[in-house]
C-alpha cells in the first residue's frame, strides 16, 4: 500500500509539472496547416518615460506553419516550415497621425523589394524534443532580414515541463527556466547569462559606469500540444550611475496567435532529415540560429577631414571652457573609431600647433589600433619641439577608459628608447603604472605586458639605476598600487630621505584599507613617533592619517592622542583638527577614537587647547540617498607661519564605490631664511622648494615645480608675473560605454554613452616680504558633457533616443597667510562658481530612405555659486585678515 502511494505521488508530481498531454516540446499534427498572426514591436524612451511618449515601430505579418517530416522512430523529432506573409510596418504610437513616417508608404517601399522577398522566403526548423537542433534558410540573405526570421523561429523552441536548462536561440546560449501549469508554460530567460559575440566596452570604475537591467519572459498557451498564443516581452533598462538623468528603456514585444488550422500538405517521406531537406530545395543551408551582427552603414556622412574642419574652431584654446568644445570632442572620437590610420595621420600632419594638443587628445582617446598607430607615427619622443603634444598623449593614455595590452606594450617600448626630455621619460613610467592598475582591475594582471611592467616598476625601486629615478618609480607605484610593492614602500617611508619618505607614505595612503595590515601600521607608528629617526612633519602627519583611517587598534589611537600636546606647535594643531574632523564627519575610526577619549589621560584640556593655524576639514559638496561628493582641505604650516603643505581633495562616492576626482597638493620647504625664522625640528637643512602635485580621476600626474633652490627662488621672486602654473590642461574622455544588444525579436539595439570634459587645473604661490604675506591659489575650471545614444535598428527603419547633460563649473581655493605676528593669521576660502546645467532629449524614427520624425525637449537650470564652509576658526580668522569695510558716508560735505 505504501509503495502504491509513493508511485502515485511521483506520477502526480510529474503530471502537475508538465502540460497535459505531452512531456517534451511542441508537436504538430500531420497534414495540417497552422495559420497564425505575428507581430513584433519595440518601444524606446527615457528611464521613466510612458509608452505613449515612446518612439518605435511595429512589424506585423501572417505566418503559416506546417509539419514537413517526422522521424519514424520518434514523435519528438520534427521538421517544420515557417513562412511569413502579408507583412506590414507601422507606428507603435498611434497618436503620430499625419506625422507618421509610414503614412502613404507601401510595405515594399518601406522594407525594400529585395528585403521583402527574402523575408517571405520560408525557413525550416529541425526540432528535437522541443529544441531547435538546426535552422535552415537561404544563403546570402540580408543579415537584418535573417535576424527577424530567427526571432520568430526562436518562439517555437520550448519545453512542456518545469525546469532550468541552457538553450541556444537568437539571444545566444542562455540559461532559461520553465514553469509549466495547466495548458500554460512561462519561460524566463536570464539575459545576463547569454553567451553571444558582440562588440562593446565600458569604464572600469563603477562610479563612472552604467547600470543595466534586462528581463525576458515568454508565456505560451497550449492546446493539443501546439500553441494557441505566445506573448514575449524583453526589457532593457540602463542608467548612468552618478547621473541618473541619463537613462533609457527599451521594451521589445512579440505576439504570435493561432487563427485557424486547415488541411495541409502531406509529409515528406524519409528516414534522415538531411535527405528530406535536399528533396525539398537543395538551396537550403544550415545557419546559426544565434543572431548575427548587423552592420549599420552611415549614408551621406562627412569624411573624417570634413568632420574635423566643421568642429575645429570649437577646439581652439580660447573656446575650451565651453561645453560645445567637449561635445565636438566626443563626436569626433566616434568618427575616429571608424577611421583608418592614413586618414588620421594626414589630419595630424596638416594641423597647426594651436589646435594640435586637442587633436592629440581626441586621437588618443579613440583607443583603436589605427588611432594608436597614427599617433605613435606622428610623435617623435627624441625631439624637444613637441613636448606638449607628448605630454597630452601620455595623459590621455592614463585616462584611457578601456586600455588594452597593446597600448601598455607601446609605452614599455617607448620607455626603453631615448627621450629629448627627462620629464617625458618620467611621465611615461608614471602612466605605465596607471595602465597596469586599469588592466588588473579588468582581470588582465597576468597579461605578458602587465607582468613586464610590474617587474620594471618593482625592480626600479629595489635597485634604481639612478638615485633620482626613485621618485619616478614611486609615482608609478602610486598609480599601479601593486600589493607586492608595500614592503618596498615601508622601506622608503622609514629609511628614505625627507621627500622620498613623504612620497612613499602618500603612496601607502592610496591603498585600500585591506592592505594596511598590522605589520604596515607598526612601521607607520615608528615613523609617527620617531622611534628610529627624526622625520619631517609632513611624513609624520601622513603616517598618522594612514593609521587613523585604516581600522586603528585601541593602542594605535591612544598613543597618537597622547602625543598631541608634545608635538611642534603647528603639527600639534594639525593633529588636533584632524582627529576632530574624523569625529565630526563620522568616519569609520570615529567609534574607536570616542572609546579612547573616555580615558581622562587621553582627553584633557591642556592637550586639546593648543593654539595654531594648521587645520583639517571635510565637508559635503552634494549629498543624495545613493551618492555623495565630498571635499577635504588640509593645511599644515611651519612654526614660522610659512605653508608646508596644502592638500585639497574631491571624492565622488556611489554606495561603497569611490572615485578620487581630484587632489591638488602644494608643498613648500626651506623658506624660513627669507624671514629670519627658525626651522622646525628635523627640517633645519632643507633646500628651498615649492611645487605642486595632482591626482585626477584616480591617476597621479607628474608633479610640477615652482622653484627649486634658493637662487631659483630669488630669481623667480624678482621676475614673478603672478601667472598661475598649469598642472593639467586638456580634453578627457571620462565615461565610455558601448554595447551592442541582440533583441530576441531579431532587432538590433545599440547603446553608446560618452562623457568628456575640458579641464584646466592651475596653481600659484605668491610671496611678499614687504607685506609679510603669502598667498596660495588653486583653480579648477571644467566644462562637462555627457552624451547618450540608444538605437533600435531593423536595417530598414530605426528608432533612437539621444540625451545630453552639460555644465561649465569652477572651484577656486585661496589661502592667505599674514606672518607679521604670531600666532600668524590664516584665511582659507573655497568658492564654487555659478554653474549652468542643461539637459537635452531627442527622440526620432527614421526610414532607410531618409524620411523621419523628430521630437526635442530641453531643460535648463542655474546652480548658484557659493563659498564652501570650513571650520569656525577659519571664519573668525578671515574676518581679521579681511576686516569688513565700514560703510561709506554719502551725506556730502567738505569733510
From Swiss-Prot:
InterPro entries: Lipid_transp_b-sht_shell, Lipovitellin_superhlx_dom, MTP_lip-bd, MTTP, Vitellinogen_b-sht_N, Vitellogenin_N. Transmembrane segments: none annotated. The keyword Membrane does not apply. It is found in: Endoplasmic reticulum; Golgi apparatus. GO terms for biological process: cholesterol homeostasis; lipoprotein metabolic process; phospholipid transport; plasma lipoprotein particle assembly; protein secretion; triglyceride transport. It catalyses: a 1,2-diacyl-sn-glycero-3-phosphocholine(in) = a 1,2-diacyl-sn-glycero-3-phosphocholine(out); a 1,2-diacyl-sn-glycero-3-phosphoethanolamine(in) = a 1,2-diacyl-sn-glycero-3-phosphoethanolamine(out); a cholesterol ester(in) = a cholesterol ester(out); a triacyl-sn-glycerol(in) = a triacyl-sn-glycerol(out). Disulfide bonds join 174-194. This is Microsomal triglyceride transfer protein large subunit. SUPFAM superfamilies: Lipovitellin-phosvitin complex, beta-sheet shell regions (SSF56968), Lipovitellin-phosvitin complex, superhelical domain (SSF48431). Residues 28-659 form the Vitellogenin domain. One of its GO terms (molecular function) is lipid binding. One of its GO terms (cellular component) is endoplasmic reticulum. It comes from Mesocricetus auratus. Catalyzes the transport of triglyceride, cholesteryl ester, and phospholipid between phospholipid surfaces. Required for the assembly and secretion of plasma lipoproteins that contain apolipoprotein B. May be involved in regulating cholesteryl ester biosynthesis in cells that produce lipoproteins. Gene3D superfamilies: Lipovitellin, beta-sheet shell regions, chain A, Vitellinogen, superhelical. Heterodimer; heterodimerizes with the protein disulfide isomerase (P4HB/PDI). Interacts with APOB. Interacts with PRAP1. It comes from the Eukaryota. Keywords: Disulfide bond, Endoplasmic reticulum, Golgi apparatus, Lipid transport, Lipid-binding, Signal, Transport. Residues 1-18 form the signal peptide. The lineage of its organism: Eukaryota, Metazoa, Chordata, Craniata, Vertebrata.
Amino acid at each position: 500500500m505504501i509503495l502504491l502511494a509513493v508511485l502515485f505521488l511521483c506520477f502526480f508530481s510529474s503530471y502537475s509539472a508538465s502540460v497535459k498531454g505531452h512531456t517534451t516540446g511542441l508537436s504538430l499534427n500531420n497534414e495540417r496547416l497552422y495559420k497564425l498572426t505575428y507581430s513584433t514591436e519595440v518601444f524606446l524612451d527615457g528611464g521613466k518615460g510612458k509608452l505613449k511618449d515612446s518612439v518605435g515601430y511595429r512589424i506585423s505579418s501572417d505566418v503559416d506553419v506546417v509539419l514537413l517530416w517526422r522521424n519514424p522512430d520518434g514523435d519528438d523529432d520534427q521538421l517544420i516550415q515557417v513562412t511569413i506573409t502579408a507583412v506590414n510596418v507601422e507606428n507603435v504610437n498611434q497618436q503620430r497621425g499625419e506625422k507618421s513616417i509610414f503614412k502613404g508608404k507601401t510595405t515594399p517601399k518601406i522594407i525594400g523589394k529585395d528585403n521583402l522577398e527574402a523575408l517571405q522566403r520560408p525557413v525550416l526548423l529541425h526540432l528535437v524534443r522541443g529544441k531547435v537542433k538546426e535552422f535552415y534558410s537561404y544563403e546570402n540573405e540580408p543579415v537584418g532580414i535573417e535576424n527577424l526570421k530567427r526571432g520568430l523561429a526562436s518562439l517555437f523552441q520550448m519545453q512542456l515541463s518545469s525546469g532550468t536548462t541552457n538553450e541556444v536561440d537568437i539571444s545566444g546560449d542562455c540559461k532559461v527556466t520553465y514553469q509549466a501549469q495547466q495548458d500554460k508554460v512561462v519561460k524566463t530567460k536570464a539575459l545576463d547569462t547569454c553567451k553571444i559575440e558582440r562588440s562593446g566596452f565600458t569604464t572600469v570604475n563603477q562610479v563612472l559606469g552604467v547600470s543595466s537591467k534586462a528581463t525576458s519572459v515568454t508565456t505560451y498557451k497550449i492546446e493539443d500540444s501546439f500553441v494557441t498564443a505566445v506573448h514575449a516581452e524583453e526589457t532593457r533598462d540602463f542608467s548612468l550611475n552618478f547621473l541618473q538623468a541619463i537613462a533609457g528603456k527599451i521594451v521589445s514585444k512579440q505576439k504570435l496567435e493561432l487563427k485557424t488550422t486547415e488541411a495541409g500538405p502531406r509529409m515528406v517521406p524519409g528516414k534522415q532529415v538531411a535527405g528530406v531537406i535536399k528533396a525539398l530545395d537543395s538551396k537550403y543551408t544550415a545557419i546559426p540560429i544565434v543572431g548575427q551582427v548587423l552592420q549599420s552603414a552611415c549614408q551621406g556622412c562627412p569624411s573624417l577631414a570634413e568632420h574635423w574642419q566643421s568642429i575645429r574652431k570649437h577646439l581652439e584654446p580660447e573656446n575650451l571652457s565651453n561645453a560645445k568644445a567637449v561635445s565636438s570632442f566626443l563626436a569626433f572620437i566616434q568618427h575616429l573609431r571608424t577611421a583608418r590610420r592614413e586618414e588620421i595621420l594626414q589630419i595630424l600632419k596638416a594641423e597647426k600647433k594651436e589646435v594640435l594638443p586637442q587633436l592629440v587628445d581626441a586621437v588618443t582617446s579613440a583607443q583603436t589600433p589605427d588611432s594608436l598607430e597614427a599617433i605613435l607615427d606622428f610623435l617623435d619622443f627624441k625631439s624637444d619641439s613637441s613636448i606638449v603634444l607628448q605630454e597630452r598623449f601620455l595623459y590621455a593614455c592614463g585616462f584611457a577608459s578601456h586600455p588594452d595590452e597593446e597600448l601598455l606594450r607601446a609605452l614599455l617600448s617607448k620607455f626603453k628608447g631615448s627621450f629629448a626630455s627627462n620629464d617625458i621619460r618620467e611621465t611615461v613610467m608614471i602612466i605605465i603604472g596607471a595602465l597596469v592598475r586599469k588592466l588588473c582591475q579588468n582581470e588582465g594582471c597576468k597579461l605578458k605586458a602587465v607582468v613586464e611592467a610590474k617587474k620594471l616598476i618593482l625592480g626600479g625601486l629595489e635597485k634604481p639605476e639612478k638615485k633620482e629615478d626613485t621618485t619616478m618609480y614611486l609615482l608609478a607605484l602610486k598609480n599601479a598600487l601593486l600589493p607586492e610593492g608595500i614592503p618596498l614602500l615601508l622601506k622608503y617611508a622609514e629609511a628614505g630621505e625627507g621627500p622620498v619618505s613623504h612620497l612613499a607614505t602618500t603612496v601607502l595612503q592610496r591603498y585600500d584599507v585591506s592592505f594596511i595590515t598590522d605589520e604596515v601600521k607598526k612601521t607607520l607608528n615608528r615613523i609617527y613617533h620617531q622611534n628610529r629617526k627624526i622625520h619631517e612633519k609632513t611624513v609624520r602627519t601622513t603616517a598618522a592619517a594612514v593609521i587613523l583611517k585604516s581600522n586603528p587598534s585601541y593602542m594605535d589611537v591612544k598613543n597618537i592622542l597622547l602625543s598631541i600636546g608634545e608635538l611642534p606647535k603647528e603639527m600639534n594643531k594639525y593633529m588636533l583638527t584632524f582627529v576632530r574632523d574624523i569625529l565630526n564627519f563620522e568616519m569609520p575610526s570615529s567609534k574607536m577614537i570616542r572609546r579612547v577619549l573616555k580615558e581622562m589621560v587621553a582627553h584633557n584640556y591642556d592637550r586639546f587647547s593648543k593654539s595654531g593655524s594648521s587645520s583639517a576639514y571635510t565637508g559635503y559638496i552634494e549629498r543624495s540617498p545613493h551618492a555623495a561628493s565630498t571635499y577635504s582641505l588640509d593645511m599644515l604650516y611651519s612654526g614660522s607661519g610659512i605653508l608646508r603643505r596644502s592638500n585639497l581633495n574631491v571624492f565622488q562616492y556611489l554606495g561603497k564605490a569611490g572615485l578620487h576626482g581630484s587632489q591638488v597638493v602644494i608643498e613648500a620647504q626651506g623658506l624660513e631664511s627669507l624671514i629670519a625664522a627658525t626651522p622646525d625640528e628635523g627640517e633645519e637643512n632643507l633646500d628651498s622648494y615649492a611645487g605642486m602635485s595632482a591626482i585626477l580621476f584616480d591617476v597621479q600626474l607628474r608633479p610640477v615645480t615652482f622653484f627649486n633652490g634658493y637662487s631659483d627662488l630669488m630669481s623667480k621672486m624678482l621676475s614673478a608675473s603672478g601667472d598661475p602654473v598649469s598642472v593639467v590642461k586638456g580634453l578627457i574622455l571620462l565615461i565610455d560605454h558601448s554595447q551592442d544588444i541582440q533583441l530576441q525579436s531579431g532587432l538590433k539595439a545599440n547603446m553608446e554613452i560618452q562623457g568628456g570634459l575640458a579641464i584646466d587645473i592651475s596653481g600659484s604661490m605668491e610671496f611678499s616680504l614687504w607685506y609679510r604675506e603669502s598667498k596660495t591659489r588653486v583653480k579648477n575650471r571644467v566644462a562637462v558633457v555627457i552624451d547618450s545614444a540608444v538605437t533600435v535598428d531593423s536595417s530598414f527603419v530605426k528608432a533612437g533616443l539621444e540625451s545630453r547633460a552639460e555644465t561649465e563649473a569652477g572651484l577656486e581655493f585661496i589661502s592667505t597667510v599674514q606672518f607679521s605676528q604670531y600666532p600668524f593669521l590664516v584665511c582659507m576660502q573655497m568658492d564654487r562658481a555659478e554653474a549652468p546645467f542643461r539637459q537635452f532629449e531627442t527622440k526620432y524614427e527614421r526610414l532607410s530612405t531618409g524620411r523621419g520624425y523628430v521630437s526635442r525637449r530641453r531643460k535648463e537650470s542655474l546652480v548658484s555659486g557659493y563659498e564652501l564652509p570650513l571650520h569656525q576658526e577659519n571664519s573668525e580668522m578671515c574676518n581679521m585678515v579681511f576686516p569688513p569695510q565700514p560703510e561709506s558716508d554719502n551725506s556730502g560735505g567738505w569733510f
